Regions:
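Sec-exported extracytoplasmic/periplasmic mature domains
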Residues: 12-13, 80, 84, 135-139
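Extracytoplasmic/secreted proteins, especially bacterial periplasmic and envelope-associated proteins
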Residues: 3, 66, 70, 129-132
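Auxiliary, metal-adjacent structural segments of Zn-dependent hydrolase domains
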Residues: 1-44, 48
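Catalytic Zn2+-binding segment of zinc metalloproteases
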Residues: 74-93
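Short pre-active-site segment immediately N-terminal to the catalytic Zn-binding motif
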Residues: 35-36, 48-72, 118-122
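Metalloprotease/metallohydrolase-associated module, dominated by Zn2+-dependent proteases
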Residues: 41, 89-172
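Generic structural signal for small/hydrophobic residues in well-ordered secondary structure
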Residues: 8, 71-73, 77, 130
Length: 172
């Protein structure tokens, strides 16, 4: 996983270093196999098409903006867990409410000001944070970085393991 490890370190600095040796990428075979899924312990399930030649023994196609963005989204869920967020529990509730109320759990309000965008990120749900990060990484891979994301990138890259908002605990 050398290609993927370099990608992780560029985006997250040392924040995921403890997780990298045990991180495993799998082809998603259950549920909606077109979608990615992140579980605790560095387990990430991705569509077969995300791997070079659709072979899960080959590297991810990280030059493709969508592949890089979705992988980054799932990596952010790993990062959130290390920050103390109960990602699986929170995401389950978000998706359940989305199904019942027809709300997009990924939708967020983008803004041009980096400070406001950072506050949006800090206040966001786990899926909104994942989508914000995905949009940031897709723009980077396309060679069109979004200036409004610079403080978010700095925050994620410099975060230390175990930093949580007051009152948050990890449940998964």
């Amino acid at each position: 996983m050398p290609v993927e490890a370099g990608f992780v370190q560029r985006l997250f600095g040392t924040a995921l270093d403890d997780l990298l040796p045990g991180m495993r990428l799998h082809v998603r075979r259950l549920g909606d196999t077109r979608r990615a899924l992140s579980l605790g312990g560095g387990r990430i399930y991705l569509p077969r098409s995300f791997f070079e030649h659709a072979d899960p023994h080959r590297p991810l196609r990280l030059a493709h903006p969508v592949v890089a963005g979705v992988f980054a989204h799932e990596l952010l869920h790993q990062w959130q867990r290390l920050q103390g967020r109960a990602v699986t529990y929170e995401a389950f509730g978000l998706h359940l409410r989305a199904a019942c109320l027809r709300r997009d759990p990924y939708q967020y309000q983008a803004c041009a000001d980096p400070h406001q965008m950072l506050q949006c990120f800090l206040d966001a749900s786990v899926e909104q944070q994942g989508q914000i990060w995905q949009d940031h990484v897709q723009a980077l891979v396309q060679g069109q970085p979004l200036a409004c994301m610079c403080l978010i990138a700095e925050h994620v890259h410099q975060a230390q393991v175990g930093q949580t908002k007051p009152g948050q605990t990890s449940k998964d």
